[in-house]
C-alpha cells in the first residue's frame, strides 16, 4: 500500500486583528490587542466516482467539511426501563429522516451530522498595563464552533458489559429506578446494548473554550538604584500559564483533542515561573 492524494479540499478564511492604546499618561499605560480568525474548508472532489469515504466517527463527503461527523443519533435513556434509545433515521420518499425511537441498535442508522471538528472561530485577547515600575500582562485564548468525539468514553462506557474495566465516575448518575431522567443507562452485567461498542452522538461534545493562557506580573527596579551598582536594568517577574479555563464540556480538555477525537492527548499544563532579567 502507499499514500496518495485522492481528492481536493478547498479552504478559505479571514483574520482580523485590532490593537488599541486605551490610556497613555506619563506614569500609566494600557494597551489591548484582539484577534479572531475564521476558516472554512470543503471537500470538492474525491477519487473517481466516489462521493464519500467513511472513517470511524467521521466521513469525508463532497460538499462537507473535511472532518464532518457521521454516527448514530442517541435519543436518551428510557425513563421507565433504563435502556439506551436511538433514532432510527430511516429516510422517507422525500429524502427526510424519520425520527422514530428504538432500543434495538440494529434498527438505528448512522447519518451525516451538521457538526465538524474544525472550529468556526479561534482567537485571543491580550492586555498590557504599566504603572511606573510595575507591569501586568494577561492573554485569553478562545475557540468556538467545533466538536470532538470522546473516544476515551467509548472504551469505558460499557454499562456493565466488562466488569473488570474502569468505570467513569459519572456512572454514579446512571438510571436506577423507573422515572429517573439521566443520560446513562442501567448498569448491569451483559446489557442488551454494550454502549462501548456503539458510536453515538452521546459522546459528541462541543470544544468551545475560553482560557487564561498567560498572566505575567513584573517589577522593574528604578535605574537610579541599579546604576549605583553598575547595572543598567533589573526586572523581576512572575508568570503563570493556563491558570483558568471555561469549557462547554469539561470532562476533558478541549485542547487535548487531535483531529476531532479525544484520546490519549496531553492537556496544556498549568505552570508558574519566577525570574529575573539583568542587563549590564
Predicted segments with their positions:
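C-terminal beta-signal and terminal closure region of outer-membrane beta-barrel proteins
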Residues: 3-11, 56-83, 174-180, 245-280
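Conserved small-residue
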Residues: 4-10, 14, 21-117, 157
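Transmembrane beta-strands of outer-membrane beta-barrel pores
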Residues: 20-22, 36-42, 131-133, 142-146, ...
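Extracytoplasmic gating/loop element in the C-terminal half of outer-membrane beta-barrel translocons
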Residues: 143-236, 240
